[in-house]
């Protein structure tokens, strides 16, 4: 969870009902079958809020280009093993449920280095550039974009990923692709 969002700075601390967004995300993760839950952040404000609701937090550098790069720093601090499965839930996804997280855990397939979830694309999200779209062929992601033309294989991407620590060690050494930079979507680095 980072403080300096280009679209809405401080987004993880925005209140949804009685709680900050980051607390909703953390609580969904804690309810899942994941063994451990940590918030990785570059912000002392976010850290303080997480500690206030008794969450576990790992401080990271402000220099990371993406959340996945931030996760890499965090897992090096907790001594992740290559075979450990990491579930990366974006800090601004308060409506991802523990059932979504469990679905990703239960269905992770080692034949693929990275996995994610998607759902039907609602009509109101078609032209919304904040709603990331995923193009799927045979249950395999072929591309991601904020601005796809509608077709039968376009869905709404959920901000959650699964990968082994071994893959993450490789991912952070890949150069950012042109598509990743243009779209501001880190998952394109894995596809490209």
Where are the regions a protein language model picked out?
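Short, high-confidence coil segments that cap the C-terminus of an alpha-helix
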Residues: 34, 82-83, 110-114
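N-terminal glycine-rich phosphate-binding loop and ensuing alpha1 helix
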Residues: 1-41
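Short aromatic/basic micro-patch
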Residues: 7, 15, 95, 162, ...
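A C-terminal functional module that forms or caps the active site or interfaces directly
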Residues: 172-192
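Conserved core of the sugar-phosphate nucleotidyltransferase
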Residues: 96-179
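Short phosphate-binding loop-to-helix
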Residues: 38, 44-89, 93-106
